[in-house]
A protein has these predicted regions:
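Non-catalytic accessory segments of hydrolases
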Residues: 1-167, 191, 281, 377-388, ...
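A structural signal for well-ordered alpha-helical segments within the folded catalytic domains
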Residues: 23, 92-93, 171-174, 178, ...
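Serine-hydrolase-like catalytic core of hydrolytic proteins
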Residues: 77-252, 302-322, 338-339
Length: 446
């Protein structure tokens, strides 16, 4: 059987998945972009687009080494990537759509932005493949975006060329959301009922989109996992402080101008960046204030009331990266909203080791992909995953994560829905315990 649909861009061929009744349309090119250029949305193609296999992931450090030989990376490799094969390329602007086989009209849409510190990850690692959401009446979308130097380098020459600089990865994400808005009706989705969701750097990305005037109207709700909220400490700053660092990288790559820098092999660029990134405060790869998409510091934008006034789900895990800080940011974000906003705290100690509810552990449950994991999950995990996916899909439908079966989640930032080894309930974690955990974490994140 062929799974053909017609979109505004042209025809697409999808494929069945391991989830009953869920059809995948994989590796859809949503944009094109040259190196250090802003993305251009794809609006058409010729013939039938083969969307039966995933597209290439963005180049990232792990593209150029064997993760099994890197002790510091082995935990997350074993968890999410072991046994899988990934293709990496600078040509990486692909997204994946997961839709019900029997279709529907005006189904809610959930667009997920992966994490990885803005330097790693992709939209089809084990925990994303395949989300259970379409079985619950929600269309799912995952995507790739440019990472590391290719996604976040800044140079004065680049600003002179385009009028603004940096954040190529964020613009990729925005263009993917635009593509979804323009095309998702062909999959049965509602372009006026889009929820964006992200975890870690993906959650921070969602946060930036929720602070931006450029993205208003593109989505109606947002979910931020382990990366949402604002703080003075974690606010974006202007690109100027990083110019000197990236000029040094360009020189060390043997390039004397932009044209030559654009021709440097990706492996060489990543190697030289990694060798030098700790030599300067400007050596990181993360969002900067570009004056267009990112227009200022988050806490100042919120103070002025210029953020998106939409419903939010936001939360963290008990053994997260900087657990007391991330939880406090999420709690404060909920507290200042004038729209229904819901706080959660995930504390299920995953079976199989003693790492607790580590950074990213909740994703197995939000996506309903426990069967892809090596861990000895039991009925507690099955029930918890069912509750979390039910609540997430209910929120995507009408901004209320309570259902007939799963009730009691109160909006506001006074307390969180605590999800763990027990029946879910409203409460707050111990601040002291979070601080102790911060310094004893066994899987601090990647």
């Amino acid at each position: 059987m062929e799974y053909l649909i017609k979109t505004p861009c042209g025809q697409l061929r999808g494929c069945p998945t391991n989830k009953e009744g869920v059809i995948a349309y994989k590796g859809i090119r949503y944009a094109t972009a040259g190196r250090f250029e802003y993305p251009r949305e794809v609006t058409s193609w010729e013939g039938v687009y083969d969307a039966t296999k995933y597209g290439a992931c963005a180049y990232q450090p792990r593209s150029f080494y064997n993760e099994e030989e890197m002790p510091k990376k082995i935990f997350y490799y074993n968890e999410f990537r072991k046994g899988e094969t990934y293709e990496y390329s600078e040509d990486c602007l692909f997204l994946n759509v997961f839709a019900p086989e029997n279709g529907g009209e005006k189904l809610p849409v959930l667009v997920y932005i992966h994490g990885g510190g803005f330097t790693g990850g992709c939209g089809h690692e084990k925990h994303f493949d395949v989300p259970v959401w379409p079985q619950k009446g929600v269309i799912g979308v995952t995507l790739n975006y440019r990472l590391g130097p290719l996604g976040f380098a800044v140079l004065p020459e680049l600003k002179e060329e385009a009028g603004y600089v940096g954040n190529y990865g964020l613009y990729d994400q925005m263009t993917a959301i635009l593509w979804v808005k323009h095309n998702i009706a062909a999959f049965g989705g509602d372009p006026e009922n889009i929820t964006i969701m992200g975890q870690s750097a993906g959650g921070m990305s969602v946060q930036q989109h929720c602070l931006s005037p450029l993205t208003k109207g593109l989505f109606q709700k947002a979910v931020m996992c382990s990366g949402g909220g604002t703080s003075k400490m974690l606010s974006a700053s202007g690109p100027e402080k990083s110019y000197e660092f990236w000029q040094m990288i360009m020189e060390k790559c043997g390039a004397s101008n932009l044209a030559e820098f654009r021709q440097v092999p990706a492996e060489k660029l990543f190697r030289i960046w990694q060798e030098n990134k700790k030599a300067s405060m400007g050596g990181g790869c993360s969002p900067c204030i570009d004056g267009r998409l990112v227009v200022g510091k988050g806490h100042e934008i919120v103070k002025r009331g210029e953020h998106h006034h939409i419903p939010y789900l936001i939360g963290t895990t008990s053994h997260d990266v900087m657990p007391p800080i991330l939880y406090s940011m999420a709690k404060k974000w909920c507290a200042v909203q004038d729209t229904p906003s819901y706080l959660w705290f995930f504390e299920r100690n995953l079976p199989g080791d003693d790492h607790g509810a580590w950074h990213s552990s909740d994703l197995w449950y939000w996506f309903g992909t426990l069967e892809n994991c090596w861990r000895p999950f039991d009925s507690v995990d099955d029930t918890l995953a069912d509750e979390m996916t039910d609540r997430l899909c209910a929120f995507a439908k009408d901004a209320n994560p309570n259902t007939e079966e799963w009730t009691g989640w109160e909006a506001g930032g006074k307390s969180a829905l605590v999800l763990g080894d027990h029946d879910s309930k409203m409460g707050n974690p111990s601040s002291l315990k979070l601080w102790v955990t911060m310094f004893t974490n066994k899987a601090p994140g990647e």
